[in-house]
Amino acid sequence: VDRPDEAAARDIFSKYLSIDLPLHPDDLANHGDDPKETIRALIAETAAEMYAKTDRTKFIEVTYGTTGKEIFYFKDFASGAMIENIVARTKKYAVKRFLAGGTKGISLRDLIPAIAEEYKENEDLPNTTDPSNWALISGKRSERVTNVKSLIDLLASSRLVEDVSGGQYL
């Protein structure tokens, strides 16, 4: 089964984001108070963000024996399950916001962080210790993979470095 491209991702999102879900009033207002148009826009903007080729969505760099290097982005590893997880996170964020006294309804402000969190959870996906596996993943089965380097910079600014007190060491 091929990985979904952006159009297929929009189709998958439409299975999980429907007009029967509560939508944030700001998002509704931005789309003429039309739930169908709001859902369409949320799906389009979310898929565009998910499939963006930016520095923060770079995942790995594969070096081939004869043809040079290729950059893979998180989008290259997208799946229906990943999209389902993004929507589940989005719903969780919306419910938590509402329970904390915020406005009810799913918003683009819930979807975008859900993408980042899903990508962050999948940071350990690539096994960079065995470059030969990447020939299969990259679709260049006849190419010899000589190196795989992680390029993960996603959410780097939000990673917390903590000072911990000394303790016992084994």
Positions of predicted regions on the chain:
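Short, surface-exposed linear patches
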Residues: 1, 21-23, 128, 134-135
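Conserved C-terminal "switch" segment of AAA+ ATPases
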Residues: 2-82, 92-101
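C-terminal engagement/docking regions of AAA+ P-loop ATPases
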Residues: 65-170
